[in-house]
A protein has these predicted regions:
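Short, ordered beta-strand-loop transition motifs
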Residues: 12-22, 70-73
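Generic alpha-helical propensity signal that fires on short helical segments
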Residues: 44-48, 62, 95-99
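Active/ligand-binding-proximal structured segments within catalytic/core domains
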Residues: 23-57, 67-68
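Short, small-residue-biased leader/transition segments that mark boundaries at the very start
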Residues: 2-12
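Histidine-acidic residue clusters that define the catalytic metal-binding segment
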Residues: 136-151
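Generic recognition of long tandem-repeat/solenoid scaffolds
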Residues: 17-30, 77-79
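Glycine-rich, N-terminal phosphate-binding loop and its surrounding beta-alpha-beta segment
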Residues: 42, 50-66, 74-88
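Active-site-adjacent, His/Asp/Glu-enriched structural segments that form or flank metal-binding
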Residues: 68-140
Length: 151
C-alpha cells in the first residue's frame, strides 16, 4: 500500500535567523494530507516522546535540535534544527530515528505523571507500526521528488 506522502517535504519549509544562527524547519509528512486518515493522538504522542529522546541523545544532532513535535493536523511532525541544512543532510538522521522508534520496546521515556501532562495517552504498538510504514514507504527509497516541497 503505497503512501502518497510528500516524504520529508521541502525539508526546509523555511529558514529563520536568530542572531547569527540559522534555524531550518523540516516537514516530516507521515500521511497524505486530506487523502488518508490522520494519526491518532496516542501514537503521535508516543512518536513525539521517542523522537525527542532520540534527538536529545544523538551524538551529532543533540546540540542542533531545537524542537521535534507533531503538526496540529496529525499528518506528521516538524523538526527544527540549528544550521543551514538541506533535506538530503537529514535523511540518514531520519532513518536512524525512525528505526529507533520502530524497534523501541519497554516504557516510553517521559510517560509518567511527573514528566508529562497526558502520560496515559500513549500507543507504542501503533508508533512502532507507523515508524515502520514511514521507513518502508518513504525513507528507505527516498528520491529527489520527495525532498522538494511542492509549490
Amino acid at each position: 500500500d503505497d503512501v502518497e506522502s510528500r516524504g520529508l517535504g521541502d525539508v526546509y519549509k523555511r529558514q529563520d535567523h536568530i542572531g547569527a544562527e540559522v534555524i531550518t524547519t523540516f516537514d516530516l509528512r507521515m500521511t497524505s494530507p486530506n487523502e488518508e486518515p490522520v494519526m491518532n493522538t496516542a501514537e503521535v504522542h508516543t512518536i513525539e516522546h521517542l523522537g525527542a529522546t532520540f534527538l536529545r541523545n544523538h551524538p551529532e544532532y543533540k546540540d542542533k535540535t531545537v524542537y521535534f513535535g507533531p503538526m496540529g493536523c496529525r499528518t506528521g511532525f516538524y523538526l527544527l534544527l540549528a544550521g543551514d541544512l538541506s533535506s538530503k543532510d537529514i535523511v540518514p538522521l531520519m532513518v536512524e530515528m525512525f528505526e529507533f522508534i520502530r524497534d523501541y520496546k519497554g516504557e516510553v521515556p517521559g510517560a509518567s505523571p511527573k514528566d508529562c501532562g497526558n502520560y496515559l495517552d500513549m500507543n507504542l504498538g501503533m508508533a512502532n507500526y507507523l515508524a515502520k510504514r514511514y521507513l518502508d514507504n518513504v525513507l528507505y527509497n527516498i528520491d529527489d521528488s520527495r525532498l522538494v516541497y511542492p509549490e
